[in-house]
Amino acid sequence: MNIKPLPDNGDLVVVKITEVKNFGANGVLEEYPGVEGYIHISEVATGWVKHIRSYLREGQRVVCKVIGVNPERKVVDLSLKRVNQHQSREKIAEWKNEQKADKLFEIVCSRLNRNPEECKEQFGRRLVELFGTLFAAFESAAQSNGEWLPEMNGDWKNVFVEIAKENITIPEVSVSGYFEVYSLASDGVERIKEVLTIPEDTGKVELEYVGAPRYRIVVKDKDYKKAEEILKKVVQIVNEKAKKLQVEVEFNKQ
């Protein structure tokens, strides 16, 4: 869902090439219905471009940077050479996510028995303003526990969250570090095992032996902040047990 009629200078946009000429190419902006773009041959690639068709063809989708906007004609000037591969991959992924979000939004509207334009004005536009993209709003709803977005009201919220949880998979993030554990006691091995035994209800925690005296810990969660909190809690538990059992422990975050 796009709430702007035109992109701004500097924006990255997904362009479908419609016509390739000797000195440039025309295309339509996938995220901006009715808006066309033009890539001059000098903005196709760095260096001299002998054959433009070596770089562009009809039907091809490319990511370009907006370098000029004509609001009256709804035409923008574009540059292909000013976009690197990393930016291009990220933009294509973002665009595909927004396509998915638009389809999910239509499902939300259908369950509410309202048309998409009505829903867009009631809450869609505001969600994009708050989260930056519609997909980000669905991600937020999918991760919610309890009331989601208390600053907004409406019967649409429960349906939106329901659709989000049914269709959005939140990838896990991980944080890690290393414990160095020492004990000179006769039963030191058993003490170290006890120190490094983490309660199962702490979270998704993996502990692996690297080589004496090092152990690697990895904490996984769908929320980075929560993963950090779990890791901090584990370190606290280990330190408390180590002190009680007279085991030396040093922790270094990776």
Curated annotation (Swiss-Prot):
SUPFAM superfamilies referenced in this protein's UniProt entry, alphabetically: eIF-2-alpha, C-terminal domain (SSF110993), eIF2alpha middle domain-like (SSF116742), Nucleic acid-binding proteins (SSF50249)
Xref: Pfam families: EIF_2_alpha, S1
S1 motif domain span: 10-81
Coiled-coil region list: none
MF (Gene Ontology): ribosome binding; RNA binding; translation initiation factor activity
CDD domains: S1_IF2_alpha
Domain of life: Archaea
Keywords of the record: Initiation factor, Protein biosynthesis, RNA-binding
Biological function: eIF-2 functions in the early steps of protein synthesis by forming a ternary complex with GTP and initiator tRNA.
NCBIfam families for the chain: PRK03987.1-1, PRK03987.1-4
Subunit (UniProt): Heterotrimer composed of an alpha, a beta and a gamma chain.
Family to which this protein belongs: Belongs to the eIF-2-alpha family.
Protein name: Translation initiation factor 2 subunit alpha
Gene name of the encoded protein: eif2a
